[in-house]
Structures are given as C-alpha cells and as structure tokens.
Amino acid sequence: MWNGANGVPYGCDHRLMTDEQRTRPVLVGDERDTLTSVLQWQRDTLMMKCAGLTDEQLRRKAVAPSGLSLLGLVRHLAEVERGWFRNVLNGEDVRGYFPQNEAGEWTEFHVEDADPAESFKVWEETCARSRAIVDAAESLDVTGHYGDEAYSLHYILAHMIEEYARHNGHADLLREAIDGVTGE
C-alpha cells in the first residue's frame, strides 16, 4: 500500500523526484487504500515541488511580509505529521522537531540557517512513522485524543490530505516564483 511508484523507495533524494515517480492514487479500491494513496500522492507532490532546487532556493521566502518557503513547508508538514499521527492518534508525547524560539514562535518556518538535508530527513522519517502507525491501526474507526476531543483515523487521513493539498498550492506558487516551473 505504501510502496513508491516505479520502484522508487521512500526516502529517495527529494532533488530527484519526478511526476512519473509519484505514487498514483488508488482509483478503485476500499476507503483505506484510497485515503492512504491520495495522502501519499500529496506527499510525493511536495517532494516534486522541491526537486532540483538548491538549498538557497528551498529557503527562498515568498513576498514580504510572508515567511513562507518550500523548506518551511517541508518542516511544517513534518510537525503536522508528528502531531496528528504520533501525538494524537498514537498517544505519544513527542515534542516538536523545530521548537519554539525565545519569542514563543514555532521555528519550522525560520529557515535561514536550516539544513535542507536534515529537514528532509526529519520529514521523510516522520512520514515513514506515520505510515507505520496507519498500517498498524485495526480500522479507520480507531481514535486518538487531543485534549477532550476524540479524532478517528478516518478524520485524520482526510485532514492530512487537506493540509497537504492546501500547502501544495502554496508550493506551486513558490516554485513558479523561483524558476518558472509549474504543474500538478
């Protein structure tokens, strides 16, 4: 269910990701396979948007006053994966990878001195852990908690697809501003 398309293993170099290597969504299948394949398609899309860029280009921010960058999106989505799959669904107490600074701001979008290779490694390892948690879940009805609220795996997968799709829209614009590359 989580295998990469065309034999490309997960954890492959994000700089080499192409459209042909993205995991294709399941078009006819059960709900779990459909949701997990669409989520993986969105993850692969983020990798594709970052492919072929230099460290400087990955750190390049959108127009002021936004601090948004492709590298910031990768780091943010690592945090989102951690939060929903490990902390909420799996009940772990895993602290942020990119903790708050002295001003109390989350630092995933502060990429001036961030190491892209390390950031991608964190994201890829977090995605692998998320896939393992999903694979181990008995059903989409399994729940986790955040505060007093319960969340099903079904909801979390749908939310993660929405989260990636929204940020991949940002990634489209960022990538086009960097080098003119556009595409799905």
Please describe what each predicted stretch is.
Residues E105-G144, H154-M160:
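Acidic/histidine-rich alpha-helical segments that form the ligand environment
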Residues D30-L35, D115-A117:
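Active-site rim elements
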Residues W2, P9-R24, R32-G104, H145-E184:
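Short, contiguous alpha-helical
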